[in-house]
Amino acid sequence: MSRIGKKPVTVPSGVTATVDGQTVKMKGPKGQLQFIVHDDVDVKFENGQVRVAPRSETKRARSLYGTARAQIANLVEGVTKGFEKKLEITGVGYRAAMQGKNLQLALGYSHDVVYQIPEGITIAVPKPTEITVTGIDPQRVGQVAAEIRAYRPPEPYKGKGVKYAGEFIFRKEGKKK
């Protein structure tokens, strides 16, 4: 049995939760999110708490209900606080800038890369070498950050490229004569 799945998700004041069959909806100060729980997992909302339990004792149901509980906890955190991912740009001439509703990246190519920001995601550029991705859905925030990083992942010799804040880049030694 999952230790995470056994804990109920407490819904704070200011957040309204509705459970309609297998769909869990959260509405809070930052917005609204929903999550469809797998059929092998049972969801109940009572006394300001969302409880998750496996419908049967199969391995699949037991493995899914801890995940469902974590996803529901992410809904609560997303509509109250939101999620944030920071990226750092390293390299001579590498920089980022906002261009209207798009993110413009100079990453050493012959042209600038223009990234269209999807709906529900906010990107800020406090410095030309820092990018902050924020939103209420952790999956979308992580996906956008990964897409930006994929334009120029950090290389192991000089560490040039786009990396997550706090990410360790394994460095290699260059060729020897």
Swiss-Prot record:
User: What GO annotations for molecular function exist for this entry?
Assistant: rRNA binding; structural constituent of ribosome
Entry-linked PROSITE patterns: RIBOSOMAL_L6_1
Listed under GO cellular component are: cytosolic large ribosomal subunit
- What keywords does the record list, in alphabetical order? Ribonucleoprotein, Ribosomal protein, RNA-binding, rRNA-binding
Q: Does the keyword Transit peptide apply?
A: no
What Pfam families does UniProt report for this protein, alphabetically? Answer: Ribosomal_L6 (PF00347)
InterPro entries, alphabetized:
Ribosomal_uL6-like, Ribosomal_uL6-like_a/b-dom_sf, Ribosomal_uL6_a/b-dom, Ribosomal_uL6_bac-type, Ribosomal_uL6_CS
NCBIfam families registered for this protein in UniProt: L6_bact
Biological role stated in the UniProt entry: This protein binds to the 23S rRNA, and is important in its secondary structure. It is located near the subunit interface in the base of the L7/L12 stalk, and near the tRNA binding site of the peptidyltransferase center.
PANTHER family on file: 60S/50S RIBOSOMAL PROTEIN L6/L9, LARGE RIBOSOMAL SUBUNIT PROTEIN UL6M
| Subunit structure and binding partners | Part of the 50S ribosomal subunit.
What protein name is recorded for this chain?
Answer: Large ribosomal subunit protein uL6
Q: Which species does the entry assign this protein to?
A: Bradyrhizobium sp. (strain BTAi1 / ATCC BAA-1182)
Where is the organism placed in the taxonomic lineage, from the top?
Answer: Bacteria, Pseudomonadati, Pseudomonadota, Alphaproteobacteria, Hyphomicrobiales
Q: Which gene encodes it?
A: rplF
